[in-house]
Amino acid sequence: PRGGVLNARILWSFSAAYRTFGDESYLKLANKSQRYFIDTFIDKKNGGVYWLVNPDGEVVNASKYTYAMTYAIYGLAEHYLATGNDESLKTAVSLYHVLEEKGREPLYDGYVESFTENWEKLDQYDNNAPKTMNAHLHVLEAYTLLYQCWKDNGLKKRLEFCVDLFMNRIYDPSRRHFNLFFDNEWNSLVEMDSYGHDVETGWLLCEAARTLENQDLIEQTNQLALDVTEACLAEGMSDKGYMIYEKKGDRKTKHASWWGQIETVIACVNAWQISGSDVYLQSVDTVWTFVKDHMVDKEYGEWYSDCFDGEPKKEAPKVSMWRCPYHTVRLGVEMYNRLK
């Protein structure tokens, strides 16, 4: 089967690559991805995005996930910025309205993790958490990009809500980490730190504040990003030079994901740009050296998805529901735009 998240990320990747580098081959693939995604994954009856289809386009799983909705908005908004395609913007705006109408939780606000095909609430959620940091991170990410191409006041208010939510509800300043899983009333359910999500959220909050052009918010998110990045470097860096995946309770894994290393590099460059401290560039060099030595497949290309205690898991697929060009392309785009 083919996933809505994977295909939305493919759409974003080739659109961003074309917008940044101008290669016509990227444009061709971006346009092909846009057409396929709109024709195949948009639920024209119930609104939203299908989770899974088979290779013939037949729907396999029509459940609605906030996560898939946000990546669809993200990919379509990027395609509009890259090409000026009105259909992409209109579809992204339509999905935004669906998410606001059907995905928001009315009592305590925020966005519920998942729904049935026709947007009915579920009796059970993954990790028993109706609200997650990860889903809201990608709402923040998608709304930031959508606001760059559609200056709607309602969208602006929802983006401001997302920034405030992360800074004052999801973030735990005593630990300098973001909580991950929540009940409906925003009580944290699990004691767990995800270092890749932490550092990614830090720099994405900075981008949201800059997009909102709010100087006070820019200063606040800059400081938060520095605090989070510093904490993750102190607690999450292994002695072999990679950012570990997570800590559950007092136990740290020895697992390194490809995307966690990427987000660490971006976060450290962002922290260096904010602070001017070369300490962050030294961390970039440490992680990037590990990546080149252990995570890049020098024979067949691309990156290995995972390493365990420094050794790559070579049998893991390079393309899957959760494995795509999005993080690696974004690394190239961010480094080019930040360092050119």
Where are these regions (language model features)?
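Glycan-recognition and catalytic cores of secretory/periplasmic carbohydrate-active enzymes
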Residues: P1-K340
